[in-house]
Amino acid sequence: MPLVYSYNSNKGRKEKNEDAIAVMKNKQGEVLAVVCDGVGSHSNAAYSSNYIVTTLEKEWQNLTFANFNNMKNWLCDKIEKLNLELFNKSQEKNKKMGTTIVTVATFDNQVVVYNIGDSSAYGLTKDNEISVVTVEDSFVGALISAGAITQEEAKTHPERHVLTQALATRDNINLHTFIDDLSKYDYFLLCSDGLTNMIENEEIQDIVRNNELSISVEKLIELCVNRGGVDNISVAIIKNLGGVNHD
């Protein structure tokens, strides 16, 4: 399935950017997008996020897969191995590490989304719907799931940044998985919580559907910055062309 993409990251009003982001193709032209948001309370947050993204980017570009299951199993195993690698490194050096992760990967007409933490992926369908396809590993995410608070209340909750799960913080992880037919979607959008905490789903839909990809990315980031930009903001958008592939 032919895909094009654009992505960028902005440190917002923070002193440094602890997000890491990349979108790349393998030798078969299949796309992997990844966003990692280093856990700010950990001293090696930026190292954790950059290490994950750089490693996945380097390895994906040189791979070919026999089928969708082969691809998704490789990616799942790789994320779990990277988690253990960073966790062991943090124990050996007595340095705290931690990062969220969200990935979107394609093969033929199928897509798989993996996530840990509170970085998100949205699917914009051909029926003009938008939905979050990730599971939020946070204290407020658990409250939302339990029906204790609403999505709107979560945005101002005093413990909204408390994660219940992140990479590199323990030796085993519960990787959330979403699988669907790629043909149902016009776009996938990945982002750190610097975007999700500052913008509504309807605004994402309006901007993405009415602009070129690179302009959409910049407009989304600019909107968040103008609203305070208190966190790093990273956005990647993948567009399903349904025609001839273009880089």
Residue ranges of predicted features:
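PP2C/PPM-type serine/threonine phosphatase catalytic domain
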Residues: 1-247
